[in-house]
Amino acid sequence: PGVALVREKILEGVWGEHYFGDVKIVDVNIRRLRMKIEDEPSAPKHILTVWGYGYRWNA
């Protein structure tokens, strides 16, 4: 919690280091997670975007 991760690190952790797709798959799946766990997905409180870097989990 509180540590920002770059998209590439998330991609590697979830899909494995041998995934050869676009890192935008992370953005798509973050959006899907927000739809499931956030009360207001357009104003997230749990999964925060760190612009130009990646994402941060806010516990």
Label for each model-derived stretch:
Residues W57-A59:
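Conserved hydrophobic "DFG−1" position in protein kinase catalytic cores
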Residues P1-Y53:
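Positively charged, aromatic-enriched patches within helix-turn-helix-type DNA-binding elements
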